[in-house]
């Protein structure tokens, strides 16, 4: 009996996490169909899981970045710049794709929803102002509020300062980083239970009946995200690596995107992405910086949301849009998306900025935001999945391309 119990425990702790997550997903759906009160009660499991991920993510970023920079060897190359360019190119490509799809399949809205009382930023300058203030945030406040721009700045600064410390101090920082990484792996093993709770409680409390009125809008939104995830991103990965991109793309969607879909938080998915980077044997000095940076500025899903909902409002009001204006909207949506992490409410609260381009009054723009909140069950989940999975995908693409280049140079040598 004891041997059977230990065998079961070993399968649970060392078995395929993806299969366990799929099992949790199916069980969550079944529970929501069988007993709504029981499904609502399991919401606590999901809340605890997301809370644990959010709690460990800031300290993970701080320790990993600090340790990697403090122990960085002189002359050792990192690949942050090409990854950042891929983030920006991916976000702009997503916005451009959303414009094209919205022109081919124009959507309209029923703007009768009461405007939300959340105040959006006044302009793109205010968004950038908020991001700059995040840079100089108090480090304790940055950790408490999960301000990843502030955490990155302090981690980089401390890392450079600690380069001049003695080896004992560097070893201590490395040990601390390894300890936090161990805790992260422990938390991630509870993903199947957390997703079981999230799925069952979401289906029990909201269902999907409220979404049917916005079926076409949702199809355009999710269709854009599918095109970006399965066509645009693989193309960018291929241009970087010159090899079949789909094994990497599908792995990232499966192991990062699925978890992000249910947690609906790029910050909470940072530990998952870090673990996947380690599994792919990527350069730790690179991914310890690029993953939290991606959670802040790599927002392809947000660019799609801003573009599609803005053009839906434009179509509803009968405002003509020419090609130059549509291209300008792509640029504005990409810039807004990169600042989405610095705005309470994320991408939805940046829609009024894009609407302002077309002279749409703020009252109507806020009704569009309210529509976004209604469809948020699916919109936010898909948006987070594409945002977070792309972080690890582009990081892996650049690292693998660099490894291939070094191997080729070694053969020539």
From Swiss-Prot:
Subcellular location, record wording: Cell inner membrane
MF-aspect GO terms: neutral L-amino acid:sodium symporter activity
A Pfam entry, by short name: SDF
Ranges that cross the membrane: 15-35, 45-65, 85-105, 142-162, 179-199, 218-238, 299-319, 331-351
GO biological process, alphabetically ordered: serine transport; threonine transport
UniProtKB keywords: Amino-acid transport, Cell inner membrane, Cell membrane, Membrane, Symport, Transmembrane, Transmembrane helix, Transport
Keyword Phosphoprotein in annotation: no
GO cellular component: plasma membrane
Membrane topology, record value: Multi-pass membrane protein
InterPro entries given in the database record: Na-dicarboxylate_symporter, Na:dicarbo_symporter_sf, Ser_Thr_transp_SstT
Catalytic activity as recorded in UniProt: L-serine(in) + Na(+)(in) = L-serine(out) + Na(+)(out); L-threonine(in) + Na(+)(in) = L-threonine(out) + Na(+)(out)
Primary role: Involved in the import of serine and threonine into the cell, with the concomitant import of sodium (symport system).
NCBIfam families: PRK13628.1 (NF010151)
Family: Belongs to the dicarboxylate/amino acid:cation symporter (DAACS) (TC 2.A.23) family.
Protein name: Serine/threonine transporter SstT
Species classification: Bacteria, Pseudomonadati, Pseudomonadota, Gammaproteobacteria, Enterobacterales
